[in-house]
Amino acid sequence: MSKLNKSIVAEFESAQITRELPKFSQGDTVVVNVKVKEGARERVQAYEGVVIATKNGGLNSSFTVRKISHGYGVERVFQTHSAIIDSVEVKRRGKVRAGKLYYLRGLEGKAARIKEDLAAAAAAKAARLAEKA
């Protein structure tokens, strides 16, 4: 791809990216509020789980959230800049060392828990308080 084409694609992508989501990474517990259309009406549905993977690719970036529902593991892949995402809230910062947490698929119960990163949580709280003041 030539430099001209790359610059045109980059300009188009920057125009399409309309909002900023909060910073989160693998191991964080997030609540994704998803717009669900049922017939003529639209409502917002919360999907809470652990981020097990992120793919950063500009406009094509995505993240995978895993939760346990009625004893079964459920994973959902969200496009980061999708219109169906109403908002994302970080509930808990996880302390993990791996880039992708696919190993959680084979674990259940207490073994599937992730330690909380208290330092990151305190820093995020301080940043929120400074932003409000």
Swiss-Prot record:
Gene3D superfamilies referenced in this protein's UniProt entry, alphabetically: 2.30.30.790
Keywords, comma-separated and alphabetical: Ribonucleoprotein, Ribosomal protein
Coiled coil: none
A Gene Ontology term for the protein's cellular component: cytosolic large ribosomal subunit
GO molecular function terms noted in the UniProt entry: structural constituent of ribosome
GO biological process, one term: translation
Keyword match Ribonucleoprotein: yes
Function field: This protein is located at the 30S-50S ribosomal subunit interface and may play a role in the structure and function of the aminoacyl-tRNA binding site.
NCBIfam families recorded: rplS_bact
Protein family according to the UniProt entry: Belongs to the bacterial ribosomal protein bL19 family.
Name the UniProt record assigns to this protein: Large ribosomal subunit protein bL19
Organism: Stenotrophomonas maltophilia (strain R551-3)
Gene for this chain: rplS
